[in-house]
Amino acid sequence: MTQWRIDTPQSLDLEGVRRLNVRIVAGSIDVVGSTEATSTGGAHIEVSQLEGALTVTLEGDTLTIAHERLTWGGLLDWVGNMGNHKASAVVSVSVPDGCPVELGVVSADAVVSGITADTKVKSVSGSVTLDGVNADISAQTVSGDLETRHLEGQLRFTTVSGDLTVVDGSSSRVKAETVSGDITLDLDVAPGARLDLNSVSGDVTLRLPESASLQIEAKTMSGSLDSAFAGVTRDAKPGRSTLRGNVGSGDGLLQAKTVSGDVTILRRDSA
């Protein structure tokens, strides 16, 4: 194991990196997948702003960049003690695009792009953007928003009040759960896809191509339900409304449930 203590802005080049773990407080983190150093596992770290030391560790093929004493399981503990921890960082990291990423942020914004391996995200209050991540994603936030662009893979997302936005995505499996956050998906769905979308008071909006093939089951207690697809009908009763029907041959499944949030299913016409 090799370890460096970073207490001033600087850059660092490493080789043999096949996995990345990042945990920072405040500031921002930008992770970019590169195809240029795949064979050597080359990684480049650029720290441009810093308050509170960072520890950089290369153990085997795992690169870890973290504020001192900040653990993956202890992210929430920092929220109540932010005044006692003077820490922030602006960091950019380039790693091989096939490098799995585990990212934890507290009051920091994060961007991950060009990664083709599984990506795991935990955010307390920072916003997270995943661009061109062509692999499975697992994301958990408290109040942070998650936006994905050009998603190709399965997505699992849980939050209290953060919003989920998927733009220009393609997936066979999406599972999203929120309390008050909104869920907005613009998605191509693979044959046999399964989408499970649950919210208490947040709205669920889904735009599907007209060629989609899904069985639709949407329920709400007091929100509104609406679908742009023929063959999907609404049944409204006191305290419960449902939206059911098939789009195409119905070989996939969309289940959406809310308490007071609205559910809207839009159709994207062919060009």
Regions picked out by a protein language model, each given a short descriptive name:
Residues 1-271:
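Intrinsically disordered, low-complexity terminal regions
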